[in-house]
Amino acid sequence: MYRECIETNKKNGGSICIFESFVLSLQKITVVFAQKMDWQTAIYRVGSYLRHCLTARHTGGHGIHSPYLFEWVRLVMRDEHSYYAWEKIEKVRERMLGDTREVEFVDYGAGIGNRESENGNREARDRRKVSDIAKRSLAKKKYAQMLARLVNWLGDGRLAMGDGRLMVVELGTSLGVTTAYMAAMDKRNKVITYEGCPAVAEIAKENWKALGIKNIDCRVGEITADMLDRDLERVDVAFIDANHTYTGTRAYFNVLAEKVHPKSVIVVDDIHYNKEMEKAWHEICEDERVTSTMDLYQMGLVFFDKDYWKRDYRIRV
């Protein structure tokens, strides 16, 4: 309904920026209250989204002077072509959204508050339905597919290693839907994904087996910067969707940024999730190793090619 209102307003010659910002903010309010979050968080999220809508530009790539980034907007972000594996992956998503099984859920991230386990580690444990995990944790279809297109675009002769593979890293496997999207684009690519919750990781593995995807290496346990530094030598594409705190996000990014090359891309999810995540994102944008960033509100993309001037973009999706 909201998208129809926006298109109607455009056809009638209305003020696109203000009207679209207003309508999409109403949509965001609906989503926020559906998630039943506390009112302070709800107000912060809505305000953050409204600010993004009012300041975001370059919806079709206009105003982006870098040919490389303009191509990314045109061929990755705005591409609407589907791929053969996507329909099967979306069926997995539907099954997860209807899965009433309960599992022991372990959280090492923003959801733990000040709780501490018996062994002294900061973690939270409770019983959750798989369907609830899916509703809260799975990336929306359009973003998961955009990540898949990103992997495909980068692997199309741009980043491939000597044996033709990309090294794709994901922090926060969840139920494995986004992982499947990225891995399915080219079976030669190697995907290393990290998940803190053993029960959730097992379900993700079941999903990949059902899809026939075999190029995923899932590593289970608390995700630490030391672990990443030890495990990874090279990063072509990275997706950070774990531990939505300032400390965790900065630690992950700092390690990954030492493993990249000029054509690598790091994607940070939920950059406006809370004040801590926004602080982490702002510091990432200012990092001297970074040349360009794209704020899509839901996620941010980080580029490292020194051939282009440093520039930060906000784009409406």
Question: Where are each of the predicted segments found?
Answer:
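A short alpha-helical cap/connector motif
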Residues: V23-F239, N243-V265, I271-V317
